[in-house]
């Protein structure tokens, strides 16, 4: 069963673009803007993955008999776990109201690397 992931591709590009903006705000020292944009990004990414996990992936599992499609869903779900670990680290960085931790940019870069790889995989093999 083919699933149209075109909307996911647009969302993925928006997530990566917003994450780059957050990093730019952190690097320029604009902590209030970084916190605002990161909060928006994090909330949307959590909702996006919850929707995929709860509805899209469950639907594919329910309707597909293709072992390759099911293996792809298994891999994408495992990637979501990796993403959530990196996202949780960044969520911790942006919690509170004081200065951002010194390793915030490194944490954002690590999150972006995992997110970009996941997005590429989902777009390449998710259809």
Where do the model's predicted regions map?
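Small-residue-biased structural context
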Residues: 1-127
